[in-house]
Regions:
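N-terminal positioning helix adjacent to the helix-turn-helix/winged-helix DNA-binding module
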Residues: 119, 147-148, 204, 284, ...
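Basic/polar phosphate-binding segments, predominantly the helix-turn-helix DNA-binding elements
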Residues: 132, 180, 349
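N-terminal helix-turn-helix DNA-binding core of bacterial DNA-binding proteins
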Residues: 132-176, 187, 302-345
C-alpha cells in the first residue's frame, strides 16, 4: 500500500488546483505527478522539464523519458483506469536508481572497521534489549514467555481470533502458536469452544491482560521518548512497506525450500519480485515494539532458510561466522559482546564451527585466551553470507527514497537508545531485588 503524502501541486489531479500552478522543487514529486498524468491520459505539466533541469541537471531529459516509458508500458500491461498500488512502489524503485546516479560514487571496499549495513542484525540487537527488559519487567507481575504474552495482548486488543490469524499477525509459524495456545489453555488464561474455534480470554486472562497492558503502555512511552506523533506515524508507514517485502522474501524461500535440491542451491539469495503479495499483514500501531517484532520474525525466518540453503549453516551459526570474519582474528571477549549471547551458547557454536573446519584459533589454551579466524572454507562462506545479507537488506529497503530511509533509521536509532536505557534500569531494579 502506498502512503505517500500529496506533494506540492498534487491536488491538481483531484481538480483542486489549476494546471498553471508552479511546479515544486521536489523532483521525485514532479516525476510522480508526471507518471500519474500519463496513466490517466491527462495533460502533463509544461513546467516539469524546466523544474527537473534545475534539480537534475543533464539527467532531467533521461529521467523524463525513463518515467514516461515505465508509466505508459505499465498502463498498457495493466489496462486499469487508475494505477494500482504496486505502480507507485515500482516507480519509487526507478526513482531510487536515478537518485543513485546523482550521488557521488564510492569506489573500493568500505573503510576498515565499517560494517556493511544489515537491517536483520540491527533489528535483532534492539529487540534483544527490549525482550530482556520486558522479561524482567513483566515477570514481576506474572511470568509468561514472550510469545504467550504477545498472544494475550492481541486477544485483549482485538478480541477473539483463530490461531491462523494470530500466527500471521505475530509472524511465527502455526506450530509455535499451537504450543503457546496449549500453555495458555493450561493456565486458564484463554478458552475456546472447539479445536478450530476462535480463542478468547477468560476472566483471569482479561484481568492479567489489563495489568500487563498498563505496563506495556508505560514501556511504550519510554521507548518512544523524543519521537513525535508525526515521526512515529511515518515510522509505522515505512514498517508496513518493509513488512510487505519481508513477507515476499519469506514466500520466496519457502518455495525454494520445497523445490528440488539442485534448483535450490543454484538460486540467488534474492530473486526478482513482481510486486504482488499475498494477504496483507496488518500491524499493531498502538505500540512500537509489536511491528518491529513481526518484521524481524518474517525477515529472520526467510534468513534462516536462505542461509541454510546457501551455506548449510543455521541462522546463528552464520551470525557467529560473520562476526568472526569481519575483523579477524577476533578475541573471545569481543566476540561474545558482539553476539550478545551467553558464553555457553557462543562456545558451543564456535566449537561446532571449528569441528566443521570453518573456524580456526590461535593463542594460549582455553577458550577465553584464544583468538579466532575463519579457515579458507570459512572465509568463502563468510563472503557468501555477507553478499546474501547485503542483497536481502537492499531488497528490503529498495522502495525507500534516500531521505525516507534516513528518517526511518534515525527514528530506529532513537528506539535503540531508549531500549538501552530501559534495559539498564530493569537490570538495576533486578539487582536491587536480589540484594
Amino acid at each position: 500500500m502506498e502512503n505517500r503524502p500529496v506533494p506540492p501541486g498534487g491536488a491538481k489531479q483531484a481538480g483542486k488546483a489549476s494546471g498553471r500552478e508552479p511546479v515544486g522543487t521536489d523532483w521525485r514529486a514532479v516525476l510522480h505527478r508526471h507518471a500519474d498524468a500519463l496513466w490517466g491520459g491527462e495533460p502533463t505539466d509544461p513546467e516539469a522539464a524546466a523544474a527537473l533541469a534545475r534539480t537534475l541537471g543533464p539527467l532531467a531529459d533521461d529521467a523524463l523519458h525513463i518515467v514516461e516509458a515505465y508509466a505508459l508500458g505499465a498502463k498498457r500491461a495493466n489496462g486499469a483506469a487508475a494505477p494500482p498500488a504496486e505502480f507507485g512502489v515500482r516507480l519509487d524503485l526507478v526513482l531510487n536508481g536515478i537518485e543513485a546516479a546523482l550521488a557521488p560514487s564510492e569506489s573500493g571496499p568500505p573503510p576498515a572497521g565499517r560494517r556493511p549495513h544489515m537491517i536483520q542484525s540491527e533489528l535483532w540487537q534492539v529487540l534483544r534489549k527490549v525482550r530482556e527488559s520486558g522479561e524482567l519487567s513483566y515477570a514481576r507481575e506474572q511470568y509468561l514467555i514472550e510469545l504467550d504474552r504477545r498472544i494475550l495482548f492481541r486477544l485483549y486488543d482485538r478480541g477473539p481470533q483463530v490461531p491462523a490469524d494470530v500466527s500471521s499477525a505475530v509472524g511465527v509459524d502455526k506450530a509455535q502458536v499451537s504450543r503457546s495456545v496449549k500453555r495458555l489453555l493450561e493456565l486458564r488464561l484463554i478458552e475456546r469452544e472447539q479445536i478450530r474455534a476462535p480463542l478468547r480470554l477468560t476472566r483471569d486472562g482479561e484481568r492479567l491482560g489489563k495489568r500487563l497492558m498498563r505496563m506495556a503502555d508505560l514501556r511504550n512511552r519510554e521507548l518512544t521518548l523524543d519521537i513525535s506523533d508525526a515521526e512515529l506515524n511515518e515510522f509505522f508507514d515505512t514498517i508496513e512497506v518493509l513488512l510487505e517485502r519481508a513477507v515476499a522474501l519469506y514466500e520466496q524461500e519457502r518455495e525454494l525450500a520445497q523445490g528440488p535440491e539442485g534448483a535450490r542451491n543454484g538460486e540467488p539469495p534474492v530473486k526478482d519480485w513482481d510486486g504482488k503479495a499475498g494477504d496483507k499483514v496488518v500491524i499493531d500501531r498502538s505500540r512500537i515494539v509489536a511491528p518491529l517484532l513481526t518484521l524481524s520474525a518474517y525477515f529472520s525466518r526467510s534468513g534462516s532458510l536462505a542461509f541454510k540453503r546457501l551455506t548449510g549453516l543455521s541462522s546463528f551459526e552464520a551470525f557467529v561466522l560473520s562476526e568472526i570474519g569481519i575483523d579477524p582474528p577476533t578475541d573471545w571477549a569481543t566476540l561474545v559482546k558482539a553476539l550478545a549471547r551467553d558464553h555457553s551458547q557462543a562456545g558451543r557454536t564456535v566449537t561446532a564451527l571449528m569441528k566443521r573446519g570453518l573456524v580456526e584459533r590461535e593463542g594460549k589454551p582455553g577458550r577465553r585466551h584464544g583468538r579466532f579466524f575463519p579457515s579458507e572454507e570459512g572465509a568463502r562462506l563468510f563472503e557468501v553470507i555477507h553478499e546474501a545479507g547485503r542483497q536481502r537488506s537492499t531488497f528490503l529497503l529498495a522502495p525507500l527514497a534516500a531521505d525516507q530511509r534516513a528518517r526511518f533509521l534515525a527514528t530506529f536509532e532513537k528506539v535503540r537508545r531508549n531500549a538501552t536505557s530501559q534495559l539498564d534500569r530493569e537490570r538495576a531494579i533486578a539487582e536491587i531485588d536480589r540484594s
